[in-house]
Structure formats: structure tokens, C-alpha cells
């Protein structure tokens, strides 16, 4: 899991976190 989002999206469950990571990663062009 991206450590960059550890403090941002780790508040959500794993499934929700995965969805958010995908969206955030896409937004950051990561």
C-alpha cells in the first residue's frame, strides 16, 4: 500500500481504502 496515503486514506476500511487509493493515485498521476 502506498505510504504516501497512509495518513490520508487509512481511516477507511481496506476495501474503501483501495478504491480511494485508485482514485487518488489516478488524480496524482501516481
From Swiss-Prot:
It is found in: Secreted. Its main location: secreted. Residues 1-30 form the Pentraxin (PTX) domain. It comes from Anarhichas lupus (Atlantic wolffish). GO terms for molecular function: carbohydrate binding; metal ion binding. It comes from the Eukaryota. Homopentamer. Discoid arrangement of 5 covalently bound subunits. Transmembrane segments: none annotated. The keyword Metal-binding applies. Keywords: Amyloid, Calcium, Lectin, Metal-binding, Secreted. GO terms for cellular component: extracellular region. Its cofactor is Ca(2+). Belongs to the pentraxin family. Binds 2 calcium ions per subunit. This is Serum amyloid P-component.
